[in-house]
Every structure is written in structure tokens, then in C-alpha cells.
């Protein structure tokens, strides 16, 4: 699975992988926040969480026996990615970064999303897609893009420089 940072989305999208199959579907992260339920509750210890995941894996193996492998593999891949992200929830909290680093990316949503994408890539996520809306301006392209470019230029340049 890969990660998509897309406004107004969240959860696992198995259909996004097309002919590759649901195992390679995207984990959708919307509005720069973790998908609901991804973070381990404070009252659940890491050991108890690991035991719970081991039990889930056992149930998954039993469930998968005799069923179509694509869907069960997709669920298993989504849970594995979620387990890895649970260990790295701090990646999504850009508020704790130095102000100078945040300022390089700007204070708007696209800047935050690109900063999160950079942090995910640095943490080992192999593919991150960031979506930005409003570029399909049709009639007034030059003026429309003139207002969009500053929001894109600054964070994209910072991300390229950092990578």
C-alpha cells in the first residue's frame, strides 16, 4: 500500500490500485490527520496491542482459507500499514516541528500536506501522493494559476530541497 494525502478523505481505498489488485491500494489521509481509529488508545499498552494484532492475524489466516486471496490480502496489507503508522503517529503532528521548518512550507493546507508527505517518505513509505484542488481553471487559466502558484511554489520547492 501507499499513502495518499488528499483533502476530505480517509481510510483504506483498495480500489485505487487498479489492475495491481487491492493488496496495493492506498491508505487515504485527509486534512493532514491520521485516519480515525489509527492511533493506539492511551489506555492500551503496546504489549496488549501486539497481542491483539497477533490474534487478528490468526483470525485472518483462518478466514482467508478457501476465500478469494485479493480481498483478504488487501485487508492484511492495510492492517500492516496501519500497524507501522501507529508506531509513527508523530509524523502527522507538524506542530512540534521548529517554526522555521514549518514556515518554509507555508501555513496553508498544501504546505502542511507536503510537509507530512516528506516526513512519511523519510520514514520509509515508498510512495506518497499529495492532491491539490483548483487547478482545472478552464476559462481564466492565467489569472487562476497566478493565484494558485504561490501556494504551490513555496512548499514544493522546500520539499524538493529537503529530499
Predicted regions and their residues:
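Ligand-binding pockets and gating/stacking loops
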Residues: 1-163
Amino acid at each position: 500500500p501507499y499513502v495518499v494525502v488528499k483533502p476530505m478523505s480517509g481510510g483504506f481505498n483498495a480500489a485505487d490500485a487498479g489492475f495491481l489488485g487491492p493488496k496495493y491500494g492506498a491508505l487515504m489521509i485527509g486534512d493532514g490527520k491520521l485516519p480515525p481509529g489509527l492511533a493506539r488508545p492511551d489506555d492500551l499498552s503496546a504489549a496488549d496491542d501486539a497481542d491483539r494484532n497477533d490474534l487478528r492475524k490468526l483470525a485472518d489466516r483462518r478466514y482467508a482459507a478457501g476465500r478469494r486471496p485479493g480481498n483478504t490480502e488487501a485487508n492484511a496489507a492495510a492492517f500492516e500499514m496501519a500497524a507501522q503508522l501507529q508506531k509513527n503517529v508523530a509524523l502527522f503532528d507538524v506542530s512540534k516541528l521548529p517554526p522555521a521548518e514549518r514556515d518554509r512550507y507555508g501555513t496553508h493546507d498544501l504546505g502542511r500536506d507536503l510537509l507530512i508527505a516528506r516526513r512519511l517518505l523519510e520514514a520509509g513509505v515508498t510512495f506518497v501522493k499529495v492532491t491539490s484542488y483548483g487547478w482545472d481553471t478552464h476559462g481564466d487559466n492565467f489569472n487562476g494559476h497566478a493565484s494558485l502558484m504561490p501556494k504551490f511554489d513555496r512548499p514544493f520547492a522546500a520539499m524538493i530541497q529537503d529530499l
